[in-house]
Each structure stands twice: as C-alpha cells, then as structure tokens.
Amino acid sequence: MTPAGSLLVARDLHKSYGSTPALDGASFSVHPGEIVAVLGPSGSGKSTLLHCLAGIITPDSGTVSYAGRELSAMSDAERSALRRSDFGFVFQFGQLVPELTCVENVALPLRLSGTRRKDAERTALRWMERLEVDDLGAKRPGEVSGGQGQRVAIARALVSSPKVIFADEPTGALDSLNGERVMQLLGEAARSANVAVVLVTHEARVAAYSDRDVTVRDGRARDLEHTA
C-alpha cells in the first residue's frame, strides 16, 4: 500500500542498541481507521518499530511523519503533547493505576487535559459501556479479571478521541477466548470512531482482526495484503 492518504508514515528506519541492530531499513504506513497488524518473532524489531512510530524513541536514521509532519522536527514537549492528544496506548498488562477505580483510570487522560471530573467520568462510562465493562466502574484493577482489565485499558486509550492507537501484544496475557473478545471489541470501537490501530503481535489469530499485515524480520518490514 502506498503512503498516499496515510496518517502515519515511516521511511527507511534504522535503530541499533549498541552494536545490535533492531531496525534495518523498516518502512510502514497506516491510513485513518485502518487496523494494521505488525507480526514477527521475538527480537525481530516489531516493538522497536511501534515505539519509533509513537515517538517514544528516536530512530538513528529514517523519518516518521504524522499528519504530514516529521516527529523529529517536533520538540520533546510537542511530541509529549501529541501522545496525549492524538495517540492512545494499550499494553500487554494494561498498566492501569492500581490505586484508582476503573472509571477513574479511564477518565484519567481527560482529567490530565483539564476536563472536569464529572464530565470526564461521564465520558469514561460511555466508553466502558461500549467495551462491556461499565459495571466495573467502582472496582479497582486488582478486583477484575485480566480480560476485563484489558477492556478497561482499551476504553482508556479511546476516551480522549485519539487518531491512532498503539497496541503492543494486547492479548498476550489472556487466554484464547478472552483474547478474541478483546480483539473484537477493540476492532469494533476503533472502526466506529475511525481510529487507526497499530497492533503488535506474534499470534496469527490476533492478526486476523486486522485489515492488513506487516511482517517484521531482522529489522525489516514487509507489507502483506490481508486475506482473512
């Protein structure tokens, strides 16, 4: 797929840790509302690619552009603001704040941006309802199952109306049934809101929920047409 009309584009990324190359000429693009699975074995460079795309780490060479602007041309403060306003994140273990209730966790991005608590929690509950966890609002993360916690994390990622969600092995800690339901809900919610998803996984069953696959091997990315 060509970068024309893409929201996020990476070109010829190289990144090494010491003498060990993690990315060796990787290129990537994702369109608005598209779900792209990044597949590859452990150590292939797929998580490094995701972190470069999100502006968390800076590649040694190559460019990452979001909405036509290169991330490297932004200041650290601008990249941080971009991650708060336009990017959402879901990780393998959710990374919810244990001291907060589930609804407070989901509302947190809005609260940090200055939204009043009542309004933030009202919006949070709407997303929790879409992710089928609105009945868990008063519970804390330690009181819910792994699958429920991941749904809460997805609601938190979507609550601030991001343009891109970066999901790094979001079902890796779940059993098959819970993993499939989490992916169904993530896909439905993202597509309904026209949110792009960059999904890092090593599981073909998880990648089956994507529109397109990108395989990373030895630090190089190769686009594949999705044939589900």
Please tell me what each predicted stretch does.
Residues M1-H14, R222-A228:
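ABC-family P-loop ATPase nucleotide-binding domain
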Residues S6-V216:
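ABC family nucleotide-binding domain
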